[in-house]
Amino acid sequence: MKILLLGIGNVLYADEGIGVHFVNYIHENYQFSHPEHQLVMLDGGTLAQGLTPIIAQYQALIVVDTVNAAGCEPGEVYFFDFDNAPPEIDWQGSAHEVEMLQTLTMMEMMGDRPHTMVLGVTPTVIEPMTLGLTERISAAVPVMEKALINYLTKLGWQCEKIGNTDIAELIPQSYIPRLSMGDRDSGNAPQGKEPQETE
């Protein structure tokens, strides 16, 4: 089985970039292995519908993004099956959040959507243009990390922590795609680092 860990968001709008920052953070600090499955990490930016042919190649998908949840404080972490979203999740946050919902719904109608999990956090600031994360979202990163690692471990993955790079250290370079579609396919990543594909 091929699993795609997909970070979604606009890094130029503060907390809206958490999906991209988080996937870069996991890629930087962990090594994953499984006797049967493959894990690929991808910085999806704000492409949404443009990712459809990529997503369709996988049997499982984990989307990391901000989520809008009625009545919830900023920094609340959610990890749920897309088919059974909590009732307070209304998908009415940023434009790319709405478009990602439309993309997954369209893929479901076409029969191309893989089993989808969503790892999300409610944002504090998504405008004006700011590069960085607010304190509440930064504090949510360890909770998101634990949720993801626990999930993968239950699926039989060996999750080895190989670094201790803070997410804030990765943000200044986040406008440069570290895990792009082309890099994933060709194996040629910027700064001499290959996107993580584990079989």
Label the model's feature ranges.
Residues 17, 21, 46, 95-101, ...:
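Conserved active-site and cofactor/substrate-binding residues in soluble primary-metabolism enzymes
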Residues 67-116:
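Helix-loop-strand module that forms the ligand-binding subsite of alpha/beta enzymes
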Residues 7, 72-75, 93, 128, ...:
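Residue-level signal for pocket-adjacent positions within structured domains
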Residues 10-11, 85-87, 124-127:
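A short, flexible beta-alpha/helix-coil linker loop
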Residues 3-6, 11-84, 159:
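Nucleotide and nucleotide-moiety/phosphate-recognizing core
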Residues 100-192:
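Phosphate-binding/catalytic loops
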Residues 10, 14, 91, 95, ...:
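Short alpha-helix boundary/capping segments
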